[in-house]
Amino acid sequence: MTNRWSFDVNKNLVTVLFTWLCLSISTAHAARIKDVAEVAGVRSNQLIGYGLVSGLPGTGESTPFTDQSFNAMLQNFGIQLPPGTKPKTKNVAAVMVTATLPPFSKQGQVVDVTVSSVGSAKSLRGGTLLQTFLKGLDGKTYAIAQGNLIVSGFSATGADGSKIVGNNPTVGRISGGAMVEREVPSPFGRGDFITFNLLESDFTTAQRMADAVNNFLGPNMASAVDATSVRVRAPRDISQRVAFLSAVENVDFDPADGSAKIIVNSRTGTIVVGKHVKLKPAAVTHGGMTVAIKENLQVSQPGPFSDGQTVVTPDSDIEVTEEQGKMFKFEPGLTLDDLVRAVNEVGAAPSDLMAILQALKQAGAIEGQLIII
């Protein structure tokens, strides 16, 4: 089988792109490579900075680090306060500014920023973020943020101390509030290979993806490195690499079904059961015991003109009620529908179902993973 992709820069890409369009027709259960994997090295980067928000209507703060930051800012503008002077900065707040720098961001482009108070400011509504340097993990400045905040929350305090707070007034956003000043180097144009990393690791999916790329480009063009990574040979010329990647990431293939899992959120009572979960033969009974303790206070009153004292004696009444639990039996190969139907028949609450699932897992009756989050 001949290679469908030409690595000669003097040849055009019409043939391979036509082949890509012809092979893009897929079944309803197929997925594109771009939907289940991402290109290694093509990633976003987190930025963070410390700054000041000014213009607050008395909802700012006057903490030591805010005053220090405010004085340092004035010194940068050539303003020197007299020694011992403590400015009243109730219209200023110290904030942390965060942003996400998308891959391939260029100088002059803008990104959104999130501004959050780090002191005792009551609200950032109506404030303006002053020029703040956003740095990466390497300590270099990649963007500069500044602008008016949009705050969805609100806060109001009455003269008697009563207070009403809606949403979160100490966090705001600035759309396009940071301008990119430095580009992050990308390994996209280097090397002879492009590596795709699956969003969910699976050996079968990785092998099927490599086979689909080989069927599209030719034999030995792609190989599964492990359960996450698939390496694809790519043109060295950067002008061909973009078109090459555009064709490859739109190749359709059938990912493997996920492993059998039961996800239990113990805080909210949410239970999600995968379609491949099955149960081995088991019998389950689940009952409840209610203990009610009622305190009755008995008062002993001494007679008139006596030296006795009034004594209060507690009288406890304990009542135990045990509900009769129903027993239900799981036959071999029980599916999700059967499990839900059986639990509903006994009227089990979500908390009861969690206890049942944990007991079944301990008994080895669940074919799958039980994950409690």
Curated annotation (Swiss-Prot):
UniProt organism field: Aliivibrio fischeri (strain ATCC 700601 / ES114)
Signal sequence segment: 1-30
Family: Belongs to the FlgI family.
Protein name (database record): Flagellar P-ring protein
InterPro entries: Flag_FlgI
GO (cellular component) term, any one: bacterial-type flagellum basal body, distal rod, P ring
HAMAP family referenced in this protein's UniProt entry, alphabetically: FlgI
Localization per Swiss-Prot or TrEMBL: Periplasm; Bacterial flagellum basal body
